[in-house]
UniProtKB/Swiss-Prot annotation:
Spans through the membrane: none
Protein location: Host cytoplasm
Membership in a protein family: Belongs to the respirovirus P protein family.
GO cellular component terms, A-Z: host cell cytoplasm
Annotated spans, Disordered: 1-23, 54-317, 433-462
Domain comment, as recorded: The N-terminus consists of a long intrinsically disordered tail. The central part contains the coiled-coil multimerization domain (PMD). Forms a four-stranded coiled coil structure. The C-terminus constitutes the alpha-helical domain that binds to the nucleocapsid (N-RNA complex).
Listed name of the protein: Phosphoprotein
Basic and acidic residues compositional bias, start-end: 7-20, 99-110, 150-168, 175-193, 453-462
Length: 568
């Protein structure tokens, strides 16, 4: 079957769906089987009819009318029918993946749009104005030469031969869908619902997906038989309410201390009677229940009565256990483990509860059970204590680390304070011992530079006159001559002045200068030294106060000593 027959089939399918006639979905599935069982389109065949000139106005039968239930007439084209048929094929459960079907739909739609655009300029606004009609030819020429068959003829043939579905079975479509009962038809077409009309009729199963399970009488009988097997031993199960009152009511001659704890495992006979509902852990304990022990003379249906010697031994063991529990409480009180015997009785701790059970136990199996519980509860309490100690040690370690950090910062701060204090002391040492210079530096007595506030005798500043150079006073000599007198004494080359202007006139010496170049270079030497900032400031200040070369030399010797002490 070629593609023309496929498109015309799907067009007739959409016409029949939209005309208002109600069909069951089983017929739809049968029609899908007929479509899917056909041979695939020959891809390498002649498809030149797709590129013929399209003129939708010449072919009045290219579009058809579709009328909805509550809407007006809407004209649909073969492109939309083709798309809806493809979508119904995908939703019908074919074996090809959804991605291939979607790619084929897009490919077809692109071909139709390409032919529609290449036809003429008149077809473009027509395609854009009507969003659904792409202008494809309704009945393209049959160049393949295949015989055409109408959709109505095939539907009649499928209705006449219902067994043809099994013969025309497609790959991947399960047989259960084909043999199922007709599903109820939803009130909307698959073209509008994207093929989801089949979904509400299929029962959902979490284990088997994609297979429709139809309930049959045999299946119902099997389910009823399976449900009837559970209460099979109901006669033996009805015995349990008789045992419960005897378990709950203790005999009047025992006090509350002899009452057995409520968390007792059941008896061995209970395990044989109802093996399905009992946990696997309780099979190990084979002691008789407490109610049977405390009321031996009351016979119950299905339980043999215990002989009286065993009952007497049980009562005797319970009395002995009560006395031993009192002795244990007294011992624990005397050792200081607990405050009083009442605390041992009323304690809800797991170890105390298992210890009381072990002391009250009547046989070795019960005692072994309770001793195991006591050991496990003690081990659990020890593990909890170990965890608490680990948390405490972790907190202590964190606090120690924080203290180390604080101590480190404090030690750095202390070093900084010590260096500041030492610089202050060195400054004070320079001010007191090296300061307060007099005119005679050789005099042993040195007056401090810090004076009390007294009236100072201000010397009148004498104005410089060039005739003062000839006088014998050292202060009025020019600087170059003055430096030359001490040139032999200064061994350090730092003190040597650079003769920047050797041919300077005599008048350049008359200009007042605030600072000698030698003092300036010495200050630069001090500033570039590795001393602290306070020491540098103190030495520069003391250097500016010097009046003679001997004082400058003494200050620089101190600077050199400090630098050597730092470097060494």
């Amino acid at each position: 079957m070629d593609q023309d027959a496929l498109i015309s089939k799907e067009d007739s399918e959409v016409e029949r769906e939209a005309s208002g006639g109600r069909e069951s979905l089983s017929d739809v599935i049968g029609f899908l089987d007929a479509v899917l069982s056909s041979e695939p389109t020959d891809i390498g065949g002649d498809r030149s009819w797709l590129h013929n000139t399209i003129n939708t106005l010449q072919r009045p039968g290219s579009t058809h009318r579709v009328k909805g239930e509550g809407e007006g007439e809407v004209s649909t084209s073969s492109t939309q029918d083709n798309r809806s048929g493809e979508e119904s094929r995908v939703s019908g459960g074919t074996s090809e993946p959804e991605a291939e079907a979607h790619a084929r739909n897009v490919d077809k739609q692109n071909i139709h749009w390409a032919t529609g655009r290449g036809a003429s300029t008149d077809s473009v606004p027509q395609d854009l104005g009507n969003g659904r009609d792409s202008g494809i030819l309704e009945d393209p020429p049959n160049e393949g030469g295949y015989p055409r068959s109408g959709a109505e003829d095939e539907n009649r043939e499928m209705a006449a031969n219902p067994d043809k579905r099994g013969e025309d079975q497609a790959e991947g479509l399960p047989e259960e869908i084909r043999r199922s009962a007709p599903l109820p038809d939803e009130r909307e077409g698959r073209a509008d619902n994207n093929g989801r009309g089949v979904e509400p009729g299929s029962p959902h199963s979490a284990r088997v997906t994609g297979v429709l399970v139809i309930p049959s009488p045999e299946l119902e009988e099997a389910v009823l038989q399976r449900n009837k097997r559970r209460p099979a031993n109901s006669g033996s199960r009805s015995l349990t309410p008789v045992v419960v009152p005897s378990t709950r009511s203790p005999p009047p001659d025992h006090d509350n201390s002899t009452r057995s704890p409520p968390r007792k495992p059941p008896t061995t006979q209970d395990e044989h009677t109802n093996p399905r509902n009992t946990p696997a852990v309780r099979i190990k304990d084979r002691r008789p229940p407490t109610g049977t022990r405390s009321a031996p003379d009351r016979p119950t249906d299905g339980y043999p009565t215990h002989p009286s010697p065993e009952t007497d031994a049980t009562k005797k063991g319970i009395e002995e256990n009560t006395s031993s529990m009192k002795e244990m409480a007294t011992l624990l009180t005397s050792l200081g483990v607990i405050q009083s015997a009442q605390e041992f009785e009323s304690s809800r701790d797991a170890s105390y509860v298992f210890a009381k059970r072990a002391l009250k136990s009547a046989n070795y199996a019960e005692m072994a059970f309770n001793v195991c519980g006591l050991i496990l509860s003690a081990e659990k309490s020890f593990a909890n204590r170990v965890d608490e100690n680990k948390q405490l040690l972790k907190q202590i370690q964190e606090s120690v680390e924080s203290f180390r950090d604080i101590y480190k910062r404090f030690s750095e701060y202390q070093k900084e304070q010590n260096s500041l204090l030492m610089s202050n002391l060195s400054t004070l040492h320079i001010i007191t011992d090296r300061g307060g210079k007099t005119d005679n530096p050789d005099s042993p007595t040195r007056s401090p530079s810090v004076f009390a506030k007294t009236k100072e005798n201000k010397t009148k500043a004498t104005r410089f006159d060039p005739s003062m150079e000839t006088m014998g006073d050292m202060r009025y000599k020019p600087d170059l001559l003055r430096e030359d007198e001490f040139r032999e004494e200064i061994r350090n080359p730092v003190y040597q002045e650079r003769d920047t202007e050797p041919r300077a006139s005599n008048a350049s010496r008359l200009l007042p200068s605030r600072e000698k170049p030698t003092i300036h270079s010495l200050k630069l030497v001090i500033e570039s030294s590795p001393l602290s900032r306070a020491e540098k400031a103190a030495y520069v200040k003391s250097l500016s106060k010097c009046k003679t070369d001997q004082e400058v030399k003494a200050v620089m010797e101190l600077v050199e000593e400090d630098i050597e002490s730092l470097t060494n």
